[in-house]
Amino acid sequence: TPPYSSAASDVYKRQGLAPKAVQLVKFARLLPSVVLSRIPYAEMSRLSGWNKADSLLAVDARLIDALPEMRAQRLVKAVSAQVPLIDSEKTSLIAFRPVDGGEEHVAIVIGDLDTDQAVLVRLHSQCLTGDLLGSLRCDCGDQLRGAIKAISEYGGGVLIYLAQEGRDIGLVNKLRAYNLQDLGSDTVEANHQIGFEVDERIYAPAAEILKQLGIQKVKLLTNNPNKIDQLAATGIDVIERVKHAFPPNPHNAEYLKTKAAKTGHLF
């Protein structure tokens, strides 16, 4: 993440190598900090053999930007099972993962689906602290349970549970951001201070799952316009945004205000 530091930083910026190197470590959920070194062309053949001998990874920089979409396209259905829920006894879970392994996402199919009509859909990013522990710092737990109840009452729909902890910066980095928030930063500033964008999520996996379920038209439970824009860009027709907001508490009130003021959330 800018600013880059080193005598050769202008070279890296012109070639676009620094952002791509940072993106690689973000994919690994590491702090986005890297050391760059230029390799003279004459040394490339020797280093190529060295990479193989020492099991070092070599990546074509041109493929890095396309990696999230490529992995989304490689998602396949791994398994499905009936899992009755408190708010919807007629529920099945369908797990998806890339054919070559990796992050697993889950489609929670609630009630009856009519894919000839617009399907009520919620895209929900994994939140260990909110979903499982009931954290008051966010509204994730309310949104998860509220979405399941709303879809059940509607008669059917899908909640796609995405492996995107902490707006896709990972649990460790999310907790680092919490520490910065306790020192006075808001959620946007904290992400920037540890080198991440305010929201690192890409919804191509969600779009691919919807398509594999035969869903092309959706009513989207969301307050986040970015979800609508990204789904629309993949060819999913979002015919309606369904408001999905819950009362704040003393611990998340400022967080929700920041989302409205700085990230365009619609409450």
Annotated model-derived regions:
Residues 41, 98-100, 113-115, 128, ...:
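Short, glycine-/Ser/Thr-/acidic-enriched flexible segments
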Residues 1, 16-20, 78, 103, ...:
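Conserved active-site and cofactor/substrate-binding residues in soluble primary-metabolism enzymes
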Residues 109-113, 117, 122, 138-159, ...:
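Phosphate-binding glycine-rich loops and their immediate beta-loop-alpha structural context
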Residues 1-8, 12:
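Single conserved hydrophobic/aromatic residue that forms the stacking wall/gate
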